[in-house]
């Protein structure tokens, strides 16, 4: 993910002008990175280092989503709808 792609994601999910670290932004950035690593893993099945990194990112996103579900239920529902994470 390059700087331009990252800034587009931040601009889409930020809450205020200087927001770069809110839970929504973090989850959106992690989701983009997870999608990149998933496509890499399809092409490179034996890349175990990347597989471990992918599982770490998925766990981090899961914890952030759990935090958000417990503290901001409406924002959680909106975020997963925007990212298309759950049905």
UniProtKB/Swiss-Prot annotation:
Keywords: Ribonucleoprotein, Ribosomal protein, RNA-binding, rRNA-binding. This is Small ribosomal subunit protein uS15. One of its GO terms (molecular function) is structural constituent of ribosome. Part of the 30S ribosomal subunit. Forms a bridge to the 50S subunit in the 70S ribosome, contacting the 23S rRNA. One of its GO terms (cellular component) is cytosolic small ribosomal subunit. One of the primary rRNA binding proteins, it binds directly to 16S rRNA where it helps nucleate assembly of the platform of the 30S subunit by binding and bridging several RNA helices of the 16S rRNA. It holds the Pfam family Ribosomal_S15. SUPFAM superfamilies: S15/NS1 RNA-binding domain. Belongs to the universal ribosomal protein uS15 family. GO terms for biological process: translation. InterPro entries: Ribosomal_uS15 (IPR000589), Ribosomal_uS15_bac-type (IPR005290), uS15_NS1_RNA-bd_sf (IPR009068). It comes from Dehalococcoides mccartyi (strain ATCC BAA-2266 / KCTC 15142 / 195) (Dehalococcoides ethenogenes (strain 195)). The gene is rpsO. Signal peptide: none annotated. Gene3D superfamilies: 6.10.250.3130, S15/NS1, RNA-binding.
């Amino acid at each position: 993910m390059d700087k331009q792609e990252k800034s587009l994601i931040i601009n889409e999910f930020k809450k205020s002008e200087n927001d770069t670290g809110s839970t929504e932004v973090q989850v959106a950035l992690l989701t983009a990175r997870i999608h990149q690593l998933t496509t890499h893993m399809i092409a490179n099945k034996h890349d175990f280092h990347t597989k471990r990194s992918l599982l770490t990112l998925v766990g981090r996103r899961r914890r952030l989503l759990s935090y958000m579900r417990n503290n901001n239920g409406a924002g959680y529902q909106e975020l997963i709808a925007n990212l298309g994470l759950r049905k």
